[in-house]
Amino acid sequence: MSVEQKLYLITRNLQEILGEEELKRIVSERELNVYWGTAITGKPHIAYLVPLMKIKDFVDAGCNVKILFADIHGFLDNLKAPIEKVQHRCAYYEKLIKSALKMLCVDLDRIQFVKGSEFQKSERYTMDLYRILSITSKHDAKKAGAEVVRQVENPMVSSLVYPSMQALDEVHLSVDAQFGGVDQRKIFTYARKYLPLLNYEKRIHLMSPMLPGLNSDKMSSSDDLSKIDLMDSKEAIWRKIRKCFCEEGNKDNGLMMIFSHIVFPILQLKGECVRITDRDGREMAFEKYQEFEEEFVRKSIHPGDLKSNAARLIDEIIRPIREEMEKDLDMVREAYN
């Protein structure tokens, strides 16, 4: 694979890159080392498929990929994951994300899976944490986590430590680049400012767009009606989609974004087109999202038909993940009661 082809796979569908020239230099010389981290908090939802599809691109481009299950981060973020539940939820996340990657035809042998607690309690990491905290102001720590850490009027000190640890993870995972959603941007710029003060090099930061919620700006694990969980039943999917805003001819809604960022890319990956059936039984087939969007804007697709087909297609996509997870319901109950 040529350098140009690798760069195309690594950068396609990203919203922003910090350190693009360094990225080009590394890819022209050797394999890129990149990681994606996920804090162990609420149940993963379908928006997780966006970064997981990007991870497939990294693997296909020959990158050395690490996935971090940030168990300590989940506990630090205003107790989103109670300490007694963290390890159970970590097992849940690992099984679920591996199931989703298999659905996306990703070779799991090409990915290294790491728990934060495996290295974040080491003497070297702890001393680095003391060092970075000693030069970080409360203002910078709070600003860095503003889009990621739960914001409360009187935050716990633990939530202010969160961005510093995420910055240090780049060093202690020995990576060239960190990948995340554009909501991570303030943490990324914090890392780029503070790591050089500890005599560590700036890392590259790759950011994907955020998928909006069904009725909100962001799909969130803490807002049940904004999201579709990767384990939701067919009935639960329909119940949530039926309630979401969808005006005839108006493409600015959460459902259309799901078609754009999840349904079309995944079906294209599987070599399938998107088939929409209306209430009269007539079928339309679409190879590209743009064609689909144009038909919706022309009002050729009714919102009711959009919702019913979205529910069907989403169920078809996540069904293999759900079925794999249902083989170990005891693990699910231990993680989320």
Swiss-Prot record:
EC numbers: 6.1.1.1
GO CC terms in record: cytoplasm
Subcellular location per the Swiss-Prot or TrEMBL entry: Cytoplasm
Enzymatic class: ligase
A biological process term (GO) from this entry: tyrosyl-tRNA aminoacylation
Main subcellular location: cytoplasm
Motif ('KMSKS' region): 218-222
S-S bonds: none
Keyword Nucleotidyltransferase set for record: no
Keyword Aminoacyl-tRNA synthetase part of the UniProt annotation: yes
Amino acids binding L-tyrosine: Y35, Y162, Q166, D169, Q184
Keyword annotations: Aminoacyl-tRNA synthetase, ATP-binding, Cytoplasm, Ligase, Nucleotide-binding, Protein biosynthesis
InterPro entries: aa-tRNA-synth_Ic (IPR002305), Rossmann-like_a/b/a_fold (IPR014729), Tyr-tRNA-ligase (IPR002307), Tyr-tRNA-ligase_arc/euk-type (IPR023617), Tyr-tRNA_synthase (IPR050489)
Motif ('HIGH' region): 40-48
Catalytic activity: tRNA(Tyr) + L-tyrosine + ATP = L-tyrosyl-tRNA(Tyr) + AMP + diphosphate + H(+)
Pfam families listed in its UniProt record: tRNA-synt_1b (PF00579)
Domain of life: Eukaryota
One GO MF term attached to the UniProt entry: tyrosine-tRNA ligase activity
Assembly description: Homodimer.
Family: Belongs to the class-I aminoacyl-tRNA synthetase family.
Stated name of the protein: Probable tyrosine--tRNA ligase, cytoplasmic
Species, as recorded: Encephalitozoon cuniculi (strain GB-M1) (Microsporidian parasite)
